[in-house]
Amino acid sequence: MTEPQEQLLQLQKDNRDGRLRKQELEELVRGLEAESESLTGRLEELRERERSLQRRRSQASRAIRGEACEAARERAERARGLLEAAEQHRQDLEQHNRKLQEQWEELSSQLFYYGGEQLSQQRAEQQLGNQLVALQKHLELAEAKFSMQAEDLRQGAQRTEEAWASFQEQSGVLQELQGKVMEAAAALEATRGGSEPWNSEPRPVQDCAGSLMEEVARADCEKRLFGGTGAGSLRLWALSALQTLLLLPLGFLVLPLIYVVLAKPDAVGPGLQSLGSDAVFRRLRYTLSPLLELRARGLLPA
């Protein structure tokens, strides 16, 4: 009679121990479920942050490309305007040179028909000839200078067009690189998601809690090691590559203009205004001063 009672007491004790063990396991499972939910929430938050960063990066790249296109168009328009101004100035100089030659011929004919003393006439003709030669040399130098400036401006416009073409090519390369970076990030996330498959083999109940905690800790450690530094370095590398590819066309667009400004500062603006009408009229007045003296002496008609 005592042996069945002892067995009953033992069974009741085992039942109480089983219930306590069951309660402990249920609490452990609830804790693991809460931790899993928090990890899932963090993962969703990180994915949302990554999507927002990708949207901001795409918006910034579009804005930078638009500004670069507008700046290139403005530089091309300025170069065309300078070329047109140089061409117009050259035509004005040629027309003024023709007028001076006509005046010289008219004055020569007047001196020939309205003679005076032979010596004074020869001296006046010699002075006028020397001044005309000097003026023609000056005009030739001015024409050569303006032709060189026009050639420099044409070369600058050509460099600008070449830089714009290279910028368009690099924009295509940039888009391809962005697609490859997104594909690599998706592949990395897929490999991380499928790298640890569930093990279908049964495990003892005593080792379940320890193995689950070890797996969660190992996953968190791997995520901190690879997900923090690897993804960050990949994003930093992609951003540096984007900045480099966007700044290269800007460098190609600015270098020709800097070269023209530093190497030949008189090729823009002041070079076009250095030969003004005042200097030309002063030289013309100096050239015609002997004729005015002849007119004052009464050797030329009024």
Swiss-Prot record:
The protein depicted here goes by the name Transmembrane protein 191
User: What InterPro entries does this protein's entry cite?
Assistant: TMEM191B/C
What residue spans carry the region label Disordered?
39-66
Alphabetically ordered keywords of this record: Coiled coil, Membrane, Transmembrane, Transmembrane helix
Kindly state one GO CC term assigned in the UniProt record: membrane
Extent of Basic and acidic residues compositional bias: 42-53
Q: How does it sit in the membrane?
A: Single-pass membrane protein
Compartments, record wording: Membrane
What's the source species for this entry? Answer: Mus musculus
Predominantly, its location class is membrane
- Which residues span the membrane? 242-262
Coiled-coil stretches, from where to where?
5-147
Q: What is the lineage of its organism?
A: Eukaryota, Metazoa, Chordata, Craniata, Vertebrata
Q: Which domain of life is it from?
A: Eukaryota
Q: Which family does it belong to?
A: Belongs to the TMEM191 family.
